[in-house]
């Protein structure tokens, strides 16, 4: 276990993560509903992150392959998703991330995205991890709700044996009986013990899986409190899905965070992050 951040290292676009470096942000709408939504969210997030000096990665999904109901909206599909990601990347000059579900999706995305994301339910899929790693790009693996924090070391080994150590692990809550998740903060120092950069997913950690019958429910009101707790452990990145009108979003309507409120929440996290890394963790490591 390591009660500190991970070792400092180079990241995207000349930025660094780890040590006392400030957090970066992965954020965007849960799913690609339409081009106008992607434009609006990315433009506003770039403005917010530029003002707050937060390194920003745009995120959105072309296919939500694990929806609870077969009738739920999944997204535009891979071909249209690639066009959308190319459009956002070229227009805003921003790194982009999307999730993949099959190894066949890796190659078509290679020249477009900067970070591959492995969904939580697929976090043990060796071929998906290894072949993503072989591209040489960063790979963000969502830690499954069922996975012990110590078992993330196996993910790191799969990455390293593929010749790539550009791994991020995202903590997104742990199953707590049926239809509920909790955030177990012990996961952060445990994962840091393997020197893996840790991202905290504040929006999915507030989910109530299957609680809405045909879809996943959630408790958006707890997101700020959960995020404060995670930041106080010292983390490298924050993951948050945002939407201008969450109740009418086509996916994760109960947990996407209101776009209009993201700036004030991030400002609060900047102060807490700076205090923890400069005054607590780094000073403690020198004792």
From Swiss-Prot:
This protein's record includes keyword Cytoplasm: yes
Top class in the EC scheme: transferase
EC number: 2.5.1.55
Annotated InterPro entries: Aldolase_TIM, DAHP1/KDSA, KDO8P_synthase
Protein's pathway: Carbohydrate biosynthesis; 3-deoxy-D-manno-octulosonate biosynthesis; 3-deoxy-D-manno-octulosonate from D-ribulose 5-phosphate: step 2/3; Bacterial outer membrane biogenesis; lipopolysaccharide biosynthesis
GO CC field: cytosol
Domain of life of the native organism: Bacteria
Cell location: Cytoplasm
Keywords (A to Z) from UniProt: Cytoplasm, Lipopolysaccharide biosynthesis, Transferase
GO MF term set: 3-deoxy-8-phosphooctulonate synthase activity
Keyword Transcription regulation tagged: no
GO biological process: keto-3-deoxy-D-manno-octulosonic acid biosynthetic process; monosaccharide biosynthetic process
Catalytic reaction(s) noted: D-arabinose 5-phosphate + phosphoenolpyruvate + H2O = 3-deoxy-alpha-D-manno-2-octulosonate-8-phosphate + phosphate
Primary localization: cytoplasm
Homology family: Belongs to the KdsA family.
Designated name of the protein: 2-dehydro-3-deoxyphosphooctonate aldolase
Source organism (scientific name): Leptospira interrogans serogroup Icterohaemorrhagiae serovar Lai (strain 56601)
Name of the gene: kdsA
């Amino acid at each position: 276990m390591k009660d500190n951040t991970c070792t400092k290292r180079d990241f995207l676009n000349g930025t660094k993560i780890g040590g006392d470096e400030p957090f970066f942000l992965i954020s965007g709408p849960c799913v690609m509903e339409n081009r106008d939504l992607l434009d609006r969210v990315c433009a506003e997030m770039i403005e917010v992150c530029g003002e707050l000096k937060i390194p920003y990665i745009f995120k959105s999904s072309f296919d939500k392959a694990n929806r609870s109901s077969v009738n739920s909206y999944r997204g535009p599909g891979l071909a249209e998703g690639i066009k959308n990601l190319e459009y956002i990347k070229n227009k805003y000059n921003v790194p982009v991330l999307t999730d993949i579900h099959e190894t066949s999706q890796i190659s078509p995305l290679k020249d477009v995205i900067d970070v591959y994301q492995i969904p939580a339910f697929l976090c043990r899929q060796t071929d998906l991890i290894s072949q993503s790693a072989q591209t040489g790009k960063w790979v963000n693996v969502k830690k499954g709700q069922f996975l012990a924090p110590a078992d993330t070391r196996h993910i790191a080994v799969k990455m390293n044996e593929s010749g790539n150590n550009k791994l991020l692990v995202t903590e997104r809550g742990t199953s707590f009986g049926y239809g509920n998740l909790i955030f177990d903060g012990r996961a952060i120092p445990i994962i840091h013990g393997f020197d893996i950069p840790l991202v905290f997913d504040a929006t999915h950690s507030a989910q109530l899986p299957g609680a809405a019958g045909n879809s996943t429910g959630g408790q958006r009101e707890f997101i700020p409190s959960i995020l404060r707790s995670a930041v106080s452990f010292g983390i490298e990145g924050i993951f948050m899905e945002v939407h201008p009108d969450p109740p009418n979003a086509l996916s994760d309507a109960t947990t996407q965070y209101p776009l209009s409120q993201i700036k004030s929440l991030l400002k609060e996290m900047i102060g807490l992050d700076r205090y923890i890394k400069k005054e607590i963790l780094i000073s403690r490591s020198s004792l």
